[in-house]
């Protein structure tokens, strides 16, 4: 398994926290780089943002066109014919990024796993099955992959990890109903989900960025004091 290439931004020298942030289908690691200064995070702890590039692969729903994708999408609802092998391969690649951050001196408990759309789905997939406690999970405009396996595969270490989920009420790509179903599944399994809705399509909004900023500041502060 080759290591994912990634863009990195450090908010201060020798960061003691990391945010691994996955992009959506067809985008790349540059997609959310410009959001870093908009988050206005506290000067301490210093944070290393890691924006990995998904592998290039053919995507069935797009006529087999090769693009950056964390897994294949085989039908419009993304549920009936999931791509378990693709999801799990990307999970392992993201786990390798977590391991790399740990090797650079960042505790698992100071690492946030985040993502948008497919990237948000992978944030949930990876974090909730990860064997060490993480700082938090941020899942924006996404659904829950391999939902039927989560109860059996959930890691006890992250049963109470803070989860931030947000979705646009006018999202034509991933309908609100799918996101609500994901939230209900998580809540039904006992997870703590902070839920936000915004009047927007499949995108981010200034209001959402403010809420993300506040949530990140909280979980990173908690991680620093633990």
Regions found by a protein language model. Give the residues of each.
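Short, conserved loop/helix-junction motifs that constitute active-site signature segments
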Residues: 41-44, 154-160
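Alpha/beta-hydrolase-fold catalytic nucleophile elbow
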Residues: 52-53, 114, 138-141, 166, ...
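Short alpha-helix in the alpha/beta-hydrolase fold that links the catalytic acid
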Residues: 32-37, 151, 175-185
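Short, proline-enriched alpha-helix->beta-strand connector loops that line the catalytic pocket
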Residues: 158-163, 189-191
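C-terminal catalytic histidine-bearing segment of alpha/beta-hydrolase fold enzymes
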Residues: 177-226
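Primarily recognizes the serine-hydrolase "nucleophile elbow" in alpha/beta-hydrolase
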Residues: 102, 107-158
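Short beta-strand/loop motif that positions the catalytic acidic residue
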Residues: 164-167, 171
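Serine-hydrolase catalytic machinery in alpha/beta-hydrolase-like enzymes
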Residues: 2-112
